[in-house]
């Protein structure tokens, strides 16, 4: 039983107008020509102005305006590029067409998701792990589920995140009111425990040095580092959570890329059902980034400090804030989990894995220190002594390639770039050639290039 406590008192989501910076009010009045008497949510005031991916998009557009005739290649945001297998889309198409008939029309479904799909998810991904279909909550994607889980957690909990980490964990925590203000000097939010995960600790936090928090956000395979936690490490994490009465929010969105037998689910670890919620997605697994389909697992054994089942509260939140995933998307999800669908999906994922290998071989040959990339689509490339946004700009300006600055994932990401294996093969090959030409002709200018590479 976890010792997480929730309070019924309302969180301070608003304050007097005098606490709103004058510059912010001036901005609103200038943009709108006036204002209401509604006071802005003070938690939104805490957010940094530039969320990572919109800022990358802004710089990308500026670059296109500056260089309108060049081919820009993205090795950046983790969007899939290959077509969804026809076997899956035809099933979705047939279902959609059926909506135009009396026999095939379907309206609202269960907020928790189609029963057949929930059963298929439990049997496909959690066979022999004791996950039941009633514990599966089908959604419109993992990122949406993270926000709904924040509604469950509330503003009075303490949180820990890997550093570097996927930005949505922290930003959603800021919005719900779990954090203090952002410190420019440390690049950290108050009231958040940042767990360093880098080469010095095999990208797994030193739990002996980690203070207790109510909630631990943990992603494996990790975005952005590309590392997957070993079975031994996840045993340590579960034991740590049980000792402290904490809940783990385990993000397994990239589990399909694991190749070495490492755990694909936190529930492979004994005792995890008592302390962990798992969030996952069809986005990277099946190329559903635009279709939008995911799921969360809330075990029956997961309880509040007073013994009340957490699954009951999450069900209430889902039925209040969500009318269920698209029935067309859910039809596609069922097709994905058929034997033929799984075979086609594996073929597409192998394509991305080959892309990743091409990029890995290229970067290693250049003497760069490359981490990750074995059980995930992402490479985590170290540029020692350099600011990640500076390296991002330098590569963009000279090669017309988009990457992702590591500092956007937290202070532990400074000096790194995330490079993605998602992309068309011809773009991956062309990008590799450009990177080779760029670094080979400029080696003497870069202190972060070494004669030996360091890969995992």
UniProtKB/Swiss-Prot annotation:
<feature type="binding site">
    <location>
        <position position="281"/>
    </location>
    <ligand>
        <name>pyridoxal 5'-phosphate</name>
    </ligand>
</feature>
<comment type="function">
    <text>Aminotransferase involved in local and systemic acquired resistance (SAR) to the bacterial pathogen P.syringae. Required for salicylic acid (SA) and camalexin accumulation upon pathogen infection. Possesses aminotransferase activity in vitro and may generate amino-acid-derived defense signals in vivo. May be involved in ethylene-induced senescence signaling. Involved in the biosynthesis of pipecolate (Pip), a metabolite that orchestrates defense amplification, positive regulation of SA biosynthesis, and priming to guarantee effective local resistance induction and the establishment of SAR.</text>
</comment>
<feature type="binding site">
    <location>
        <position position="292"/>
    </location>
    <ligand>
        <name>pyridoxal 5'-phosphate</name>
    </ligand>
</feature>
<dbReference type="GO" id="GO:0010150">
    <property type="term" value="P:leaf senescence"/>
</dbReference>
<dbReference type="GO" id="GO:0062045">
    <property type="term" value="F:L-lysine alpha-aminotransferase"/>
</dbReference>
<dbReference type="GO" id="GO:0042742">
    <property type="term" value="P:defense response to bacterium"/>
</dbReference>
<keyword id="KW-0611">Plant defense</keyword>
<dbReference type="InterPro" id="IPR015422">
    <property type="entry name" value="PyrdxlP-dep_Trfase_small"/>
</dbReference>
<dbReference type="GO" id="GO:0009536">
    <property type="term" value="C:plastid"/>
</dbReference>
<dbReference type="InterPro" id="IPR015421">
    <property type="entry name" value="PyrdxlP-dep_Trfase_major"/>
</dbReference>
<keyword id="KW-0934">Plastid</keyword>
<keyword id="KW-0150">Chloroplast</keyword>
<feature type="binding site">
    <location>
        <position position="223"/>
    </location>
    <ligand>
        <name>pyridoxal 5'-phosphate</name>
    </ligand>
</feature>
<dbReference type="GO" id="GO:0008483">
    <property type="term" value="F:transaminase activity"/>
</dbReference>
<feature type="transit peptide" description="Chloroplast">
    <location>
        <begin position="1"/>
        <end position="43"/>
    </location>
</feature>
<keyword id="KW-0032">Aminotransferase</keyword>
<protein>
    <recommendedName>
        <fullName>Aminotransferase ALD1, chloroplastic</fullName>
        <ecNumber>2.6.1.-</ecNumber>
    </recommendedName>
</protein>
<feature type="binding site">
    <location>
        <begin position="142"/>
        <end position="143"/>
    </location>
    <ligand>
        <name>pyridoxal 5'-phosphate</name>
    </ligand>
</feature>
<dbReference type="InterPro" id="IPR004839">
    <property type="entry name" value="Aminotransferase_I/II_large"/>
</dbReference>
<dbReference type="GO" id="GO:0009627">
    <property type="term" value="P:systemic acquired resistance"/>
</dbReference>
<dbReference type="InterPro" id="IPR019942">
    <property type="entry name" value="DapL/ALD1"/>
</dbReference>
<feature type="binding site">
    <location>
        <position position="108"/>
    </location>
    <ligand>
        <name>pyridoxal 5'-phosphate</name>
    </ligand>
</feature>
<dbReference type="GO" id="GO:0009862">
    <property type="term" value="P:systemic acquired resistance, salicylic acid mediated signaling pathway"/>
</dbReference>
<keyword id="KW-0663">Pyridoxal phosphate</keyword>
<dbReference type="GO" id="GO:0062034">
    <property type="term" value="P:L-pipecolic acid biosynthetic process"/>
</dbReference>
<keyword id="KW-0808">Transferase</keyword>
<feature type="binding site">
    <location>
        <position position="251"/>
    </location>
    <ligand>
        <name>pyridoxal 5'-phosphate</name>
    </ligand>
</feature>
<feature type="binding site">
    <location>
        <position position="254"/>
    </location>
    <ligand>
        <name>pyridoxal 5'-phosphate</name>
    </ligand>
</feature>
<feature type="binding site">
    <location>
        <position position="323"/>
    </location>
    <ligand>
        <name>pyridoxal 5'-phosphate</name>
    </ligand>
</feature>
<dbReference type="GO" id="GO:0030170">
    <property type="term" value="F:pyridoxal phosphate binding"/>
</dbReference>
<dbReference type="InterPro" id="IPR015424">
    <property type="entry name" value="PyrdxlP-dep_Trfase"/>
</dbReference>
<dbReference type="Pfam" id="PF00155">
    <property type="entry name" value="Aminotran_1_2"/>
</dbReference>
<feature type="binding site">
    <location>
        <position position="283"/>
    </location>
    <ligand>
        <name>pyridoxal 5'-phosphate</name>
    </ligand>
</feature>
<dbReference type="GO" id="GO:0009507">
    <property type="term" value="C:chloroplast"/>
</dbReference>
<keyword id="KW-0809">Transit peptide</keyword>
<comment type="similarity">
    <text>Belongs to the class-I pyridoxal-phosphate-dependent aminotransferase family. LL-diaminopimelate aminotransferase subfamily.</text>
</comment>
């Amino acid at each position: 039983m976890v010792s997480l406590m929730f309070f019924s008192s309302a969180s301070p989501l608003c304050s007097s107008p005098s606490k709103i910076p004058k510059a912010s009010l001036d901005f609103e009045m200038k943009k709108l020509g006036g204002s209401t008497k509604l006071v802005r949510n003070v938690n939104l005031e805490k957010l940094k102005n530039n969320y990572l991916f919109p800022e990358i998009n802004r710089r990308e557009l500026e670059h296109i305006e500056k260089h309108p005739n060049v081919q820009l290649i993205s090795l950046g945001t983790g969007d899939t590029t290959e077509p969804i297998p026809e076997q899956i889309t035809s099933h979705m198409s047939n279902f959609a067409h059926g909506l135009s008939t009396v026999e095939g029309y379907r309206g609202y479904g269960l907020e928790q998701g189609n029963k057949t799909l929930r059963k298929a998810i439990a049997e496909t991904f959690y066979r022999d792990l004791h996950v039941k279909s009633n514990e599966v909550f089908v959604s419109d994607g993992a990122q949406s589920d993270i926000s709904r889980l924040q509604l469950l957690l509330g503003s009075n909990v303490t949180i820990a995140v890997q550093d570097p980490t996927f930005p949505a964990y922290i930003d959603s925590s800021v919005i719900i009111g779990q954090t203090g203000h952002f410190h420019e000097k440390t690049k950290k939010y108050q009231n958040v425990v940042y767990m360093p995960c880098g080469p010095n600790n095999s990208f797994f936090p030193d739990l002996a040095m980690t203070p207790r928090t109510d909630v631990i956000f943990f992603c494996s395979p990790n975005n952005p580092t590309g590392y997957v936690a070993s079975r031994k490490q996840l045993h340590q994490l579960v034991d740590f959570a049980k000792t402290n009465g904490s809940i783990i929010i385990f993000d397994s969105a990239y589990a399909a890329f694991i190749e070495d037998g490492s755990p694909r689910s936190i529930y492979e670890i004994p005792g995890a059902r008592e302390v962990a919620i798992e969030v996952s997605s069809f986005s990277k697994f099946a190329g559903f980034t635009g279709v939008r389909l995911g799921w969360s697992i809330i075990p029956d054994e997961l309880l509040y400090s007073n013994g009340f089942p957490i699954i009951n509260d999450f069900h209430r939140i889902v039925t209040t804030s969500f009318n269920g995933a698209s029935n067309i998307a859910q039809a596609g999800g069922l097709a994905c989990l058929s034997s033929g669908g799984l075979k086609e999906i594996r073929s597409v994922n192998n394509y991305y894995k080959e892309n990743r290998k091409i990029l890995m071989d290229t970067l290693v040959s250049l003497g760069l220190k490359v981490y990750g990339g074995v059980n995930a689509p992402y490479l985590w490339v170290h540029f020692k002594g350099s600011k990640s946004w500076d390296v991002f700009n330098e590569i963009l300006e000279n090669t017309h390639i988009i990457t992702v600055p590591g500092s956007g994932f937290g202070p532990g990401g400074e000096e790194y770039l995330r490079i993605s294996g998602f992309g068309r093969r011809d773009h991956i090959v062309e990008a590799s050639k450009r990177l080779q030409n760029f670094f080979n002709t400029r080696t003497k200018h870069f202190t972060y290039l070494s004669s030996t590479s360091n890969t995992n």
